[in-house]
């Protein structure tokens, strides 16, 4: 008679699986809560203690760590010495292992979890069983995912055993699962001891979906989610309407969320296009904020991704409905607003809980050939009290407020980045140019006649020469905010003084590549 060892924390479909094994001639070894569940369901089992002749000890910390278990798993059936050893020691082979692990991840997601509670949910015996069975997949079937129960039972019923191909795939799946399990534990404990730069970086993500394609149609792509999901994330958004999100949709929507998170005090609308804001507007109402974001660049917003920081009302929905948009993401939608927007078949409407927008961020990871770069996200909150006025002209309180608005916008624009804005909206965005003066020219050209005494210019990095300041001044800019720090800062200050421009140094650069 073949033997199966079953010990699971997730008991979904457990009884049916065990009954299927029994019907196909398996004897079930089990322990703890799993044994109790099976016994109550009328499935005959034998306890681990009956196999090992050794009781559970240390409050259940040691149950299956025993040669009578691991010998039965690791013995190679075609190795005469191995089998002779089993016979000599009266160890019976175990042909199938079904184990899933203590819920460590679910435990540490609890808001009030203690370190002691987390540690008690680190599984030791489970991973040992899974790894032993997987190592010997030539002879042993190993199952850790309830979604594989039917496949295993089907093959056993039809062929008397699982196929070698299936056993190999299940073994590989187990090693992925145990590696991910250990990674979550390692990351939790590393965080507990406050280590920022561990010598080994362990990352684990769960497959959320296979994408139709990647950035371009000839590229394959997959979407993976952090093993410990973040609440304020495009991956946690609830899609109310429209087609599935594409690879590019997700990237643009993610950038839109990063940007809208900067604006919390007033109704604000961010229009994102190819990872750059083409328009940001704010107002007393969401409709007013939309009008200003649209006015910022009524051409580029076509086909854009829109993030709003207030619930979408009917008036705003009617205006958004007039143009083609890829995505609208907001904290919610009034029923009548949703009804209007749903008339467009392909628009993607996403609802996300904005109450978690201030939760701590996780490091950004960028792939490079042969490795990765990791850095903290740029979540620096600027404070006007820390800024330094470097010109004779002093900025007004209104200009300082507008500078802050423009700085938040330029922070989410690809470098070299220049943003021209007034106190209500962006007027022009110059993004991604190899030199700063070209970005300035693009932003000022887009702003055009909208430049007035309220307009300010923000730069994500210092001006290497005075040309940007002079160009801006000649086109009506009265105030500039930039990090400072160039060896030629003096030249830029002199030009600003020549034209009576107020200029502020923040001391912080905001490159974005």
Swiss-Prot record:
<dbReference type="GO" id="GO:0005829">
    <property type="term" value="C:cytosol"/>
</dbReference>
<keyword id="KW-0808">Transferase</keyword>
<keyword id="KW-0511">Multifunctional enzyme</keyword>
<dbReference type="GO" id="GO:0004643">
    <property type="term" value="F:phosphoribosylaminoimidazolecarboxamide formyltransferase activity"/>
</dbReference>
<protein>
    <recommendedName>
        <fullName>Bifunctional purine biosynthesis protein PurH</fullName>
        <ecNumber>2.1.2.3</ecNumber>
        <ecNumber>3.5.4.10</ecNumber>
    </recommendedName>
</protein>
<feature type="domain" description="MGS-like">
    <location>
        <begin position="1"/>
        <end position="144"/>
    </location>
</feature>
<dbReference type="Pfam" id="PF02142">
    <property type="entry name" value="MGS"/>
</dbReference>
<dbReference type="Pfam" id="PF01808">
    <property type="entry name" value="AICARFT_IMPCHas"/>
</dbReference>
<dbReference type="InterPro" id="IPR011607">
    <property type="entry name" value="MGS-like_dom"/>
</dbReference>
<dbReference type="InterPro" id="IPR036914">
    <property type="entry name" value="MGS-like_dom_sf"/>
</dbReference>
<dbReference type="GO" id="GO:0006189">
    <property type="term" value="P:'de novo' IMP biosynthetic process"/>
</dbReference>
<keyword id="KW-0378">Hydrolase</keyword>
<dbReference type="GO" id="GO:0003937">
    <property type="term" value="F:IMP cyclohydrolase activity"/>
</dbReference>
<dbReference type="InterPro" id="IPR002695">
    <property type="entry name" value="PurH-like"/>
</dbReference>
<dbReference type="InterPro" id="IPR016193">
    <property type="entry name" value="Cytidine_deaminase-like"/>
</dbReference>
<dbReference type="InterPro" id="IPR024051">
    <property type="entry name" value="AICAR_Tfase_dup_dom_sf"/>
</dbReference>
<keyword id="KW-0658">Purine biosynthesis</keyword>
<comment type="similarity">
    <text>Belongs to the PurH family.</text>
</comment>
<comment type="pathway">
    <text>Purine metabolism; IMP biosynthesis via de novo pathway; IMP from 5-formamido-1-(5-phospho-D-ribosyl)imidazole-4-carboxamide: step 1/1.</text>
</comment>
<comment type="pathway">
    <text>Purine metabolism; IMP biosynthesis via de novo pathway; 5-formamido-1-(5-phospho-D-ribosyl)imidazole-4-carboxamide from 5-amino-1-(5-phospho-D-ribosyl)imidazole-4-carboxamide (10-formyl THF route): step 1/1.</text>
</comment>
């Amino acid at each position: 008679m073949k033997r199966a060892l079953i010990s699971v924390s997730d008991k979904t479909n457990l009884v049916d699986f065990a009954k299927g094994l029994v019907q196909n001639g398996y004897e079930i070894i089990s322990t703890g809560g799993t044994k109790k569940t099976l016994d109550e369901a009328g499935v005959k089992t034998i306890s681990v203690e009956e196999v090992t002749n050794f009781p559970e000890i240390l409050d259940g910390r040691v149950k299956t760590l025993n040669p009578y278990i691991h010998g039965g798993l690791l013995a190679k059936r075609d190795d005469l010495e191995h089998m002779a050893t089993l016979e000599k020691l009266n160890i019976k082979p175990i042909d199938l292992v079904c184990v899933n692990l203590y819920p460590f991840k679910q435990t540490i997601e609890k808001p009030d979890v203690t370190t002691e509670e987390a540690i008690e949910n680190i599984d030791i015996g489970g991973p040992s069983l899974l790894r032993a069975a997987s190592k010997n997949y030539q002879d042993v079937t190993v199952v850790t995912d309830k979604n594989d129960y039917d496949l295993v039972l089907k093959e056993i019923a039809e062929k008397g055993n699982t196929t070698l191909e299936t056993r190999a795939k299940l073994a590989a799946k187990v090693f992925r699962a145990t590696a991910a399990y250990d990674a979550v534990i390692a990351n939790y404990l590393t965080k507990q001891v406050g280590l920022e730069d561990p010598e080994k970086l362990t990352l684990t993500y769960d497959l959320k979906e296979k994408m139709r394609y990647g950035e371009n149609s000839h590229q394959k792509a997959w979407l993976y989610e952090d093993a410990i999901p973040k609440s304020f994330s495009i991956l946690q958004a609830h899609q109310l309407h429209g087609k599935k999100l594409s690879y590019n949709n997700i990237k643009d929507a993610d950038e839109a969320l990063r940007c809208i998170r900067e604006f919390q005090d007033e109704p604000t609308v961010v229009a994102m296009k190819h990872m750059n804001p083409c328009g940001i507007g704010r107002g007393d109402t969401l409709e007013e904020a939309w009008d200003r974001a649209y006015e910022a660049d009524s051409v580029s917003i076509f086909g854009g991704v829109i993030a709003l920081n207030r619930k979408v009302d009917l008036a705003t929905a009617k205006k958004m409905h007039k143009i083609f948009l890829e995505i609208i993401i907001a904290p919610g939608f009034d029923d009548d607003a949703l009804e209007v927007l749903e008339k467009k078949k392909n628009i993607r409407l996403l609802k996300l809980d904005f109450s978690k927008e201030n939760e701590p961020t996780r490091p950004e990871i960028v792939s490079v050939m042969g490795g990765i770069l990791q850095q903290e996200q740029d979540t620096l909150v600027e404070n006007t009290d820390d800024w330094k006025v470097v010109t004779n002209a002093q900025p007004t309180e209104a200009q300082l407020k507008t500078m802050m608005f423009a700085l938040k916008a330029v922070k989410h624009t690809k470098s070299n980045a220049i943003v021209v804005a007034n106190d209500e909206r962006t007027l022009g965005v110059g993004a991604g140019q190899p030199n700063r003066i070209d970005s300035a020219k693009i932003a000022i050209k887009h702003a055009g006649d909208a430049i007035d005494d309220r307009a300010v210019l923000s730069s994500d990095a210092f001006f290497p020469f005075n040309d940007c300041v002079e160009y801006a001044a000649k086109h009506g800019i009265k105030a500039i905010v930039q990090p400072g720090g160039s060896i030629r800062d003096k030249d830029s200050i002199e030009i600003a003084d020549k034209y009576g421009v107020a200029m502020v140094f923040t001391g912080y650069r905001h490159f974005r590549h």
